[in-house]
Each structure stands twice: as structure tokens, then as C-alpha cells.
Amino acid sequence: HDGIVANPNCCTIPLTCVLKPLHEEAGLARVRLATYQSVSGAGARAMERLRGEAPADHDLRMDWDFDGDEFDEEAKLRAETRKIMELPELPIQATCVRVPVLVGHAEAVWLETEEPLAPERARELLASAPSVRVEDFPSPGKAAGIDEVLVGRIRRDPTIENGLALFLASDNLRKGAALNAIQITELLLSRERAAA
């Protein structure tokens, strides 16, 4: 609808923050990822249930709609990433799971670039990317309560040509929702002022 802006999925936002500078440098050819999503993404009831159980006993409900092949969360991640990155044909395969963590989503990402991209160069690009912080070992616990997407474990993926592997974590209630909505509003207001 004209005049309505949709806030992307809480896993799409951190993923695209990390993919964008890598794509601008070397072009993306393919992306595969697994998400490890905290129970806060399923709501307050899920958080209360986790608080009352030992994590080992927690029933990891996959609370997304399933079409027989994939969860709608996986399809949404693919569609939104393609749209945001302006790469409508980009091959993306995602597997999404819910984990017994209160706040913070994590993603293991394997990507293939069109041009060679050394892990050291990827680290440099990500270290200077907006809303991204390079950490040796990102985790949902480290990401909880902060605005940046934490990314680390950046290394060559020897199973494919021009392959990189990395791990990221973000606060799904901040960067994945509220903060991102504020940043979108600020961007729209700055564009409006510039046009006036």
C-alpha cells in the first residue's frame, strides 16, 4: 500500500546488514543459512514457559506455518532478503529453528561470492559497515541489549569456490524489531526533509 512501510523479519534485518557490504565488494552468488531463534520471537507466553522449565526439558515448538516443504519463516527470509538486496534471483536456502534462549537470534551463514573475497577483507568490510560489530565469537547473550549486529567466525568455506562462512547474533527485540522501525522512520523523515 502506498505510504505504508513494512519492517522486515527479525532474522532478515541482521542478515542483510552483513550481506550488503560483502555483496557490494564481491557480488553474491548464493546464500545458505540456519537460524537459531530465541523464544521471545514467539511471544511473552513462550518466554514465561521457558523461565519455568529447564532448557533441556523445553519443547522447542516450531511455531511457524509449515507448507510440507518449509516453514513460512524460511520462505519469508528468502523473499525479504532478495527484495532488500535487490537480487530477485539470488539462490537462498534457510532452515529456521527455535532454541531455548530468552532473547537474541543467531544465524550460521554460508555464502558464495561471484568474485574472490578473502576472510580478512570481509572482516574489514564488516568492521566499517553501519550497524555491524565484528566479534570473535558472537552469541545471543552478547547481542542482548545492544543495537549492533554481532558477526564473527568469518572464514573460508572450502566446500565451494569463493565460499565464506560466518556466524552472527542480534537482539531480535531491538535490531530485529523496535530499533529497526525507528531507523526506518528516521530515514523516511530525512528523505522528506531533503525533498522539501
Regions found by a protein language model. Give the residues of each.
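Conserved short-loop catalytic and cofactor-binding motifs
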Residues: 6, 65, 169
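Glycine-/Pro-rich loop/turn segments that contact NAD(P) or position catalytic residues
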Residues: 1-34, 40-49
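NAD(P)-dependent Rossmann-like dehydrogenase/reductase catalytic/cofactor-binding core
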Residues: 148-150, 155-196
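Conserved residues at beta->alpha junctions
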Residues: 9, 113, 168, 172
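Predominant activation on well-ordered alpha-helical scaffold segments within soluble catalytic domains
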Residues: 16-23, 78-82, 123, 152, ...
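C-terminal substrate-binding/catalytic lobe of Rossmann-fold NAD(P)-dependent oxidoreductases
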Residues: 30-35, 39-166
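A glycine-rich, Thr/Ser-enriched phosphate-binding loop motif common to dinucleotide/cofactor-binding enzymes
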Residues: 3-14, 69-75, 173-180
